[in-house]
């Protein structure tokens, strides 16, 4: 794409896309699947829960994997990393604030090729 840094010869090893999203389910910090509350009532006001996520556009931006990696010595691919943030959730009939997993970055994973 025509990002200003590309004019300077700078490129990301993995392309990502970020957006505000809503969630209906998520994985909590204990690994349980929980229901994310669509609306949060605080002080008689209703707020919608949004989460800012970053995902990989493509796990292999180049045929050999990540952009700029020497494929003669390295295997590579792009993958998402995540973190935990607080969200109002339901598990069974229990509503509470829990840490849920959201995707926050797209990074390049490399492994050395055998015989190198």
Curated annotation (Swiss-Prot):
Main location: secreted
Pfam families: NGF (PF00243)
Binding site for a 1,2-diacyl-sn-glycerol: 86
Matches recorded under InterPro entries: Cystine-knot_cytokine, Nerve_growth_factor-like, Nerve_growth_factor-rel, Nerve_growth_factor_bsu, Nerve_growth_factor_CS
Subcellular location: Secreted
Disulphide-bonded residues: 14-78, 56-106, 66-108
PTM annotation, UniProt: Not glycosylated.
Keywords carried by this UniProt record: Disulfide bond, Growth factor, Lipid-binding, Metalloenzyme inhibitor, Metalloprotease inhibitor, Protease inhibitor, Secreted, Toxin
Entry GO CC: axon; dendrite; extracellular space; synaptic vesicle
Transmembrane segment boundaries: none
UniProt record, GO biological process: cell surface receptor protein tyrosine kinase signaling pathway; modulation of chemical synaptic transmission; negative regulation of neuron apoptotic process; nerve development; nerve growth factor signaling pathway; neuron projection morphogenesis
Listed GO MF terms: growth factor activity; lipid binding; metalloendopeptidase inhibitor activity; nerve growth factor receptor binding; toxin activity
UniProt tissue specificity: Expressed by the venom gland.
Similarity annotation: Belongs to the NGF-beta family.
PANTHER family, A to Z: BETA-NERVE GROWTH FACTOR, NERVE GROWTH FACTOR NGF -RELATED
Cited function: Nerve growth factor is important for the development and maintenance of the sympathetic and sensory nervous systems. It stimulates division and differentiation of sympathetic and embryonic sensory neurons as well as basal forebrain cholinergic neurons in the brain. Its relevance in the snake venom is not clear. However, it has been shown to inhibit metalloproteinase-dependent proteolysis of platelet glycoprotein Ib alpha, suggesting a metalloproteinase inhibition to prevent metalloprotease autodigestion and/or protection against prey proteases.
Subunit structure: Homodimer; non-covalently linked. Interacts with NTRK1.
Protein name, UniProt field: Venom nerve growth factor
Species of provenance: Naja atra
């Amino acid at each position: 794409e025509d990002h200003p840094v590309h004019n300077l010869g700078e490129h990301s090893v993995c392309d990502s896309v970020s957006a505000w999203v809503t969630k209906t389910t998520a994985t909590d910090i204990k690994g349980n699947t929980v229901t994310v509350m669509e609306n949060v009532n605080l002080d008689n006001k209703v707020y919608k829960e949004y989460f800012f996520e970053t995902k990989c556009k493509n796990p292999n931006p180049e045929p050999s994997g990540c952009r700029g990696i020497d494929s003669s010595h390295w295997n590579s691919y792009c993958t998402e990393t995540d973190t935990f943030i607080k969200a109002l959730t339901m598990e069974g009939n229990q509503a509470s604030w829990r840490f849920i997993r959201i995707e926050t970055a797209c990074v390049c994973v490399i492994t050395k090729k055998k015989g190198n």
